[in-house]
Amino acid sequence: PLLAQQDENGVYGSADLIRGMTIMGPSGTYAHYLIIGYLNYFGLTIDDVNYVNMEYPQAMQAFELGDGDICCMQNPNVYDAKQQGYVSLGDPAVVAPMYENLVCSGKIYAEDSDTVVKFLKVVYRAQEDFLKDDKLAAEWLGKYYEKVGYQASEKAVMDEVQNQKPLLSLAEAAQVPVGESLVDTAKFMQDLGLIEESQTKQVEGNVCPDLLKKLCEESGVEWKQ
């Protein structure tokens, strides 16, 4: 029944279908954050479902044995799950967008911000190269997985590159509020009781868009924040 309804954004489900379901995944992680975003998308909260705290391998094992209704997975296992007939319920970028954040120490920010801007320039140049060349992106993503001990087939890596590109060009980054997802994550952790409100405010106070703005100005990219 859950797969019977898909909206214009490609997201499966409805409030009536999801309410009361058992969802398995690790608490306090992006998977948990994503599930909350998915529920909020349909006007629900985590209290409307039975969320079971389980690590990815245990959740997947239980799911394969027939337990639960929805299971959280992480790359590169998402591709393999699709090959087994499992269905992704929606694009994370639609229900709970999350962008990685680059951070630096307060010392280098205060004393050598020009070096940070140069670093940002290199990062976005690499990302734009990856966005232009799927094979290049897959090659380096595969190297990353190998380095951290993940086993991923070439097909799984390419699927992630082609269907779940989490990279932004500099022009795209100029339109995304700097630190927004970081602050949202802090609020999420606060709601779980993992950090205090004062720590969330500290995160908010440490968001500094000025260096990215400077890079955009130097690169002739319009700043739209």
Language-model-detected regions and their locations in the chain:
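A conserved helix-loop-strand patch within extracytoplasmic ligand-binding domains
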Residues: 1-61, 65-67, 75-83, 106-111
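Extracytoplasmic/periplasmic, Sec-exported soluble proteins
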Residues: 10, 23-30, 51, 55, ...
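Short coil/loop linkers at secondary-structure junctions
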Residues: 40, 45-47, 87, 147-153, ...
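Pocket-lining segment of extracytoplasmic ligand-binding domains
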Residues: 58-147
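Short amphipathic alpha-helical segments at helix boundaries and their inter-helical linkers
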Residues: 64-68, 165-178, 211-219
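Secondary-structure end/capping motifs
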Residues: 112-196
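Conserved C-terminal helix/tail region of periplasmic/extracytoplasmic solute-binding proteins
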Residues: 183-225
